[in-house]
Amino acid sequence: MPITCFIRYQIDPFQREAFKRYAQAWGEIIPRCGGRLLGYFLPHEGSNDVAWGLIGFDDMAAYERYRARLRSDEQGRANFERAQAERFILREERSWLEDVFAAPR
């Protein structure tokens, strides 16, 4: 069963560009590790401290394989470490969604 990991970030609105660089780095890392990056999103209007990331997987087993690869990915570890050091992510929540309908690719 296809699933999507929906990540909601509370970000420091004064470090928007730092989060943008963080999100852009995942554009290479996630596919290399086996995830299907659906996108990262920053606020355009409205609340300025919330961002989102969506990553698709064929099933939970595919997600577990992705996690194992990600742990050994040098660029992935560096991206996590940079986020911790620079503190532009204040909070992160993950929800797992069952894909009911997805737009054609």
Question: What does each of the following model-derived ranges do?
Answer:
Residues 40-44:
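Short, solvent-exposed loop/turn elements at beta->coil junctions and helix N-caps
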Residues 10-12, 56-58, 97:
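Solvent-exposed residues in well-ordered beta-strands and their adjoining turns
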